[in-house]
Amino acid sequence: ASTFEVGRMDPPMVDKDAQLFKSPFTVTVSIPSGATLRYTTDGSTPTLNNGQTSTTGIFDVSSTVTYRFRLIKEGTLPSAVVTRSYLYKDRDIVLPVISVVTDPINLYDDSLGIYVRGVNGRTGNGQRTPCNWNMDWDRPVNFEYLTTDGEMVINQEVDMAMCGGWSRAWTPHSFKLKAEKIYEGKNFYDYPVFKTKPYLKHKTFQIRNGGNDNGSRIKDAALQEIVRTSGIYVDGQAYQPAVHYINGNYVGLLNIREPNNKHFAYANYGYDS
């Protein structure tokens, strides 16, 4: 006889949000009766065949780690994955923090990865040989945003795609984080990252490396702010500098920007398409 799953497990409850830390601490994750808690620390999705099992739900944290937790129970669909980035504060950080966590294959695999030159891309943007980062591929990632006070205000499954022109070849790479309804039924971010603008709903953030200004990374943002605040009836893309981690690895300073597309019109003026 065939067996069908009925319903879906609720996501595991994690008692600590993503955070920067200096002192060791303990994280506790709920394990309902009859369920198995599976987890990974490499960014990949926990399944019965991938990751490790915890029987206690207790995790001691003393160094940077990115956990992905999932509950599995026979006869029930596995829960959604819950992600937490615990980042050891080994440097002074006075800016917001972006943490992106995903299966390394999505970024670094030669055939499928969007963050590498790879072997499955196309030429262009100053590159004579094919490059994966030139492709307009979407890859699923978890996106966490921590404020300057260390509060986790965004933790969301989203799509990541590369962006830019010639600067696609420069590291760290520029990319987009796109909220999509297929993840949790939510195609927007509900936190006002840009304090300089009235907040409606942002559907996409561009995470930019500064383009030609890859030293200070503020030239374009500064010019847009000058124009935006000059009294001239011309709008500009809002700007928020942030430090960036990928799978717990420190990348550096990048800029969060509004996109210059239909999502800009939606976020600023409510025009949807």
Outline where the language-model segments fall:
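Short, compositionally stereotyped local motifs that mark structural "simplifiers"
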Residues: 1-140, 145-159, 181-182
